Design a protein with these regions (language model features):
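N-terminal segment of the mature folded domain
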Residues: 1-35
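A ligand-binding cleft/hinge motif common to bilobed small-molecule-binding domains
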Residues: 1-8, 93-122
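N-terminal hydrophobic or amphipathic helices and topogenic motifs
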Residues: 6-16, 37-43, 49, 150-175
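Periplasmic-binding protein-like
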Residues: 26, 116-145, 166-172
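Short helix-loop capping/hinge motifs at secondary-structure junctions, enriched
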Residues: 34-40, 134-139
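Short loop->beta-strand "edge-of-pocket" segments that line small-molecule binding or catalytic clefts
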Residues: 43-63
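Hydrophobic residues within well-ordered alpha-helices
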Residues: 45, 65, 93-97
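Short beta-strand-to-loop elements that line the ligand-binding cleft
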Residues: 75-88
Length: 175
């Protein structure tokens, strides 16, 4: 939950920035409905010869995917990864739902939207980064006020894998 604070501090030298908690979300494997390959871990992608749709190299979920593979003692080159990367989580889930891939790493809500199986592998905090002076301005305050409404909370609850109980909490207040 705090792995990004040092990156913000390093990148914001001379800038007054505030990091605001938005939500916690689950990242994991989006799997074909019913999980026909019986995938129960990231290691099963290789063992079960799953066709994997990955995100583009610069996507945060691709960086996380490569990290999770390394933790499991494997790498992307060991997998059957589709040539064309997914440009977003909806694209990734669509390819799995159409049978073009067996699995891919994305947020739980992408799997939920397409009625696919989901294997949670990582929980991460999603934050907003704003300049300190902007935090106190009307647009940011209106966004935070809207995000505290019942309608917003209901919509967040409908999106599987998101938790927003601490939304708006300042988790970093730059130098």
């Amino acid at each position: 939950g705090t792995y990004n604070r040092h990156l913000v501090a390093e990148a914001s030298t001379g800038l007054d920035l505030v990091l605001i908690e938005w939500a916690w979300r689950d990242q994991g494997l989006v799997l074909a409905a019913g999980n026909p390959l019986g995938i129960t871990s990231i290691e099963d992608l290789r063992a079960n010869k799953a066709r994997v749709v990955a995100r583009q190299a610069e996507a945060g979920s691709r960086i996380l995917f490569d990290h999770l593979l390394a933790e499991a003692g494997t790498k992307a080159a060991d997998l059957e990864i589709l040539e064309k990367p997914a440009r977003g989580e909806t694209d990734l889930a669509l390819r799995v739902s159409e049978g073009k891939a067996d699995a891919g790493l994305a947020v739980a809500s992408a799997a939920h939207a397409f009625k696919l199986n989901f294997l949670s592998l990582h929980r991460e905090r999603f934050d907003l980064l704003v300049r300190r002076r902007d935090y106190f301005e009307d647009p940011v305050q209106k966004l935070l006020a809207f995000a505290r409404t019942d309608a917003f909370e209901a919509r967040a609850a409908d999106m599987a894998g998101y938790e927003t109980s601490a939304l708006g909490k300042v988790v970093y207040n730059g130098p």
